[in-house]
Amino acid sequence: MEPSACEDLKAFERRLTEVVSSYRPSTFRWRKLLAVVLSAMSMCTAISAWYWLRDPRTTVVPLTESLWIHPVFTVATLTLVVLFILGIQKLVIAPQIITSRTRMVLGDFNMSCDDTGKLILKPRQSNNNST
């Protein structure tokens, strides 16, 4: 392998490990925040859904009025829906997304990478067409 190609690979590997490692602290913070928020919102949704379904007025009044009568259920459910529509769960797995997409691209060049961004050079496949 040429020295310039080797230097390019090393520079690419340094940059990839830098990008992956820079996501780790924010990913950890998002995981903690998401765990707290999702548990709180899930508990609120579950408990308020129980009261909402047990309310005798639920079967009589229109849905919008029923949701207006039970604001905790409405807000908790809307919060969960909005969080997932915005893709909050992707912030938790950002480094894995980056490394998996990089592996797909590197596969064309007979390479791969580990979860930290270190390059893995695969041995070349030999073409034995001799009979």
UniProtKB/Swiss-Prot annotation:
Which terms in the Gene Ontology molecular function aspect does this entry carry? protein phosphatase regulator activity
Keyword list, A-Z: Cytoplasm, Lipid metabolism, Membrane, Nucleus, Transmembrane, Transmembrane helix
Classify the protein's membrane topology as the record does.
Multi-pass membrane protein
- Please cite one Gene Ontology biological process associated with this protein: lipid metabolic process
Asked whether the keyword Nucleus is assigned, the reply is yes
Q: Looking at the keywords, is Nucleotide-binding present?
A: no
Which residues are listed as membrane-spanning? 33-53, 68-88
Which Cys pairs does UniProt list as disulfide-bonded?
Answer: none
| Location(s), subcellular | Nucleus membrane; Cytoplasm
| Matching Pfam families | Tmemb_18A
GO cellular component, alphabetical, reads: cytoplasm; endoplasmic reticulum membrane; Nem1-Spo7 phosphatase complex; nuclear membrane
Q: What does this protein do?
A: May form with the serine/threonine protein phosphatase l(1)G0269 an active complex dephosphorylating and activating lipin-like phosphatases. Lipins are phosphatidate phosphatases that catalyze the conversion of phosphatidic acid to diacylglycerol and control the metabolism of fatty acids at different levels.
Per the record, the similarity remark reads: Belongs to the CNEP1R1 family.
Supply the name of the protein. Nuclear envelope phosphatase-regulatory subunit 1 homolog
